[in-house]
Amino acid sequence: MRFEYQKNESIPSLSWLAEISKRGGIINITHGTTVECYENFFVSGVWDGEFEKGEFDTALSFHGTGGIALEDSDFVTFVTPNHLQESLYSLVQNDEFLISNSLPFLLAYSGHQLDTNYYGYEYDLNSIFFGSKRCVKELKLKNAIVQMHRYCNLKVSCNLLWKEIPKSAKVELRTFNDYKLKMSETLHKIISNASDAKRKCQYNLVTTVSKGYDASASSALVHDLGCNTALTFSSPEKYVNDSGVEIAQLLGYKNIIEGNGCAYMNNTALWEAESASCGDVGCLVAFNTFEQVYKDSLLFLGLKGDSIWGKDESLANRNFDFIKMSIAAEQNPEHYLRNNTIAISVPLILGYEWPSIYEINNSSEMEKYSVGGEYDRPIPRRLVEEKGVPRKAFGFKKHGAGFTYRFQPTLKSVKSKMSLTSYNSLLDYSKSIKRNRLKYYAYVCKYYMKNFPTYFNYVMHRLHSPFKIKCTSKYMSSPIASLLILWGMNEMIKRYKKAI
């Protein structure tokens, strides 16, 4: 099998779609301008290996997606990252196998759409928090099913038969120094890969920093490897006490860029729709404010450090099963594809060795870096303190950036957290879609009955009351989140259709 390429300068620069006809032997790739395309492989990503060899399918740390094919082989291998934050999406129709790193691209190309009477999309898209073995692998459409491929190498034959091969990367980690050295070595190789002269685009380096553990530790690791630009929110009031300016200065960063966490609300480009289409109903859209800074860059983040670096994560496992679903999706792939940004969550590098990382975190050598309490992460604390940052300067109160729409009770209540352009678009969409009203109201009633404790506890928190009631462990997509995802996907499909 062999690749044939068609560049489309109008689609997001890192997006691609592969089309395989039954028994044809040709894999047609439609791709954006910065997808790296060669005879035997194509890739939108970076890894800890030599770029020209294209061996990202066996990498210890791959960030992005791509495909590998040999002309004398009867199958092609499509590759996902060594974590669950990105997926590949496929479907078979009319004796053709279609696969893409963009769900809206796949739907726009195939002519399919989401089902407006299905309310589980938030759960399905964010089930990555349940790990590689428990996550949802099929996405219901109006008249079809999309397969979601995560944390695997996907082999597809010329007869359109496919099989997922689970990732199998392993490293041995016994001590803190083992972990620190392997992380630094892996990051160095990734950065070398990203700056290879044979690439169409050599990527810059940008990190995020705050007074929390995860972003600070990530920034401590990448500074010595050439990263000198750090982003942080310093306003409005919510972010003042979490500003990472002081931490960045102590770590040695020279180019420190401060932003306003609410500046995204001035956008007219439907950033919220772009984010929602991937299942992220809030959380990361605030970072879009910095998009021109991290354009054409590797963007280092501290996402999932609360689990991978958490001292009390006794259920640590190799499958990235975070046991319970987060209220924040922590993924924004459509934005990164458009902006030619490769997001790298530093805690997820070697994250498949979570059990070993947990043992190191709780070992005797780390005791002096444990400060006690619920917010206690010895590994990131040691990484930062060894760079000369005083203990009292960070890691004592969890703030977190962003927000979530999912607990908003009404469409009108979303308005205060969304740009006017996006809100008006969402409002118009909500009026245009046709839904089974009886089914909708039944779902809404069930949702609020099940999640009453969550809303009650929120009110108690606002009243500064210590009284709480136990919340349900059963996750259920919120009605507002479901609407946001439908709207976001509809807008992104329109964007792709216009481009193709």
What are these regions (language model features)?
Residues 101-121, 128-131, 371-391, 425-429:
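Charge-dense polyanion-binding interfaces
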Residues 142-144, 370-372, 396-398:
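Short coil/turn segments at secondary-structure boundaries
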Residues 158, 165, 169-387, 391, ...:
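ATP-dependent adenylate-handling active sites, centered on carboxylate activation for C-N bond formation
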